[in-house]
Amino acid sequence: FVAASNEIVLVTTPEPTSITDSYSLLKALYKRPDFDPSKVCIRVISNRAASKEDGSIVFNKINSVVMQFLNGSLEYLGYVPSDAMVEKAVRQQKILSIYDPTSKAARSFEEIAKRLLDNESAALDEKRTISHVFSNFFNRKQ
């Protein structure tokens, strides 16, 4: 489904292996003959970042490598800080935004969701619908 999408949200963490895996995924995507980077918006979320700056550093590392070696660019969607409340909510099998809506991670999720919705509203057209994604997916299989 990634290759059939017009919008991709890539979630990575500050760990070197996560950054490497993210780049490897993007490299494989860019090498696909049916991939047209001019028609795809790839956004990045830095997960479990120590700070806002740490999240930006993670994004800048991936984006600079993509620009240099794949001749592409990414958009930064935001970061989710490391937050003990995430683990506590998981252990309680609760949704974080219900378990502790004031936690740092819950507030970051809300900010990211607002950005996604703002982008969706600004770009609401046929190319963004799920039917278009499925149409692209099945047309590429032929």
Which residue stretches match the model-derived regions?
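Phosphate/oxyanion-binding loops and surfaces in catalytic or ligand/nucleic-acid-binding neighborhoods
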Residues: V65, F69, D83, R115, ...
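Beta-strand-loop-alpha "switch" segments that mediate conformational coupling across diverse proteins
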Residues: Q68-I95, F109
